[in-house]
């Protein structure tokens, strides 16, 4: 009998509708039947209270048509909207139009070399370019650019070192050669903030950030605190690199940073094709596959322009 009464109640209310189009019988719950007495609740969240009272009266009239019912009790309920967690405002980097991350799932894939190549090529295309070496634990940008000096400061701001029109900053400028940097995540993240926001950039079109490998504190700090325009992911053909890159892709997708493309470095030496697989699986453009070239390593060691050896189709992706 209880089931029959529940169906009768729902059926009786099916033609009572709120002005916003909500059917009354779709927002009732907690139907209780005790003998000939019934009760239920109506969720009036976001509804006009006067209209709700009018529809409640209509509901009672309709239910009184069921002869078995003696007493009707209807209560209103209202769910509180979930409070949105206040989002911390993200920083813009002064005098920088676009920020592009260059990232990888693991170390040793040539990420810093690719970062330098991207910066050098954009500079040759007459863009104003800067590069930040955010690989706190293994800074190699100073070596690639042949920089052995410490940046100057002015009015409390760091002046980046300019090499062939590219403005360069790195934690490597501030530590002794071969010294280990032993910092926990918060200290490393604070240092990245100083490299980005305390540096006095001179009207950049692009700021390229050479990220540390992995998906740690520095990555989260960057994604949560700065307005970023996209990330280029560097991989190598081996399966082990592909596995680690998938974690990076997952991070950037979850935090809604556009993945501009994948660059596969050290290509054609191995049977596997990590860059191609990832491109197809995640529908991410494969920007380039760069073969192993001894000349590239030699150019990095001698701080020679990488653009003399190869170029990337950047205009299609940035």
Swiss-Prot record:
GO terms, biological process: iron-sulfur cluster assembly
Pfam families in alphabetical order: ParA
Record-linked PROSITE patterns: MRP
Q: Which InterPro entries match?
A: Mrp-like_CS (IPR000808), Mrp/NBP35_ATP-bd (IPR019591), NUBPL-like (IPR044304), P-loop_NTPase (IPR027417), YlxH/NBP35 (IPR033756)
Question: Which terms does the record give in the GO molecular function aspect?
Answer: 4 iron, 4 sulfur cluster binding; ATP binding; ATP hydrolysis activity; ATP-dependent FeS chaperone activity; metal ion binding
* CDD domains given in the database record: Mrp_NBP35
Q: Does the keyword Transferase apply?
A: no
KW Manganese (keyword) present: no
Keyword set, alphabetical order: ATP-binding, Hydrolase, Iron, Iron-sulfur, Metal-binding, Nucleotide-binding
Residues annotated for ATP binding in this entry: 105-112
Q: What family is reported?
A: Belongs to the Mrp/NBP35 ATP-binding proteins family.
Assembly description: Homodimer.
Describe its function.
Answer: Binds and transfers iron-sulfur (Fe-S) clusters to target apoproteins. Can hydrolyze ATP.
Name the chain's protein: Iron-sulfur cluster carrier protein
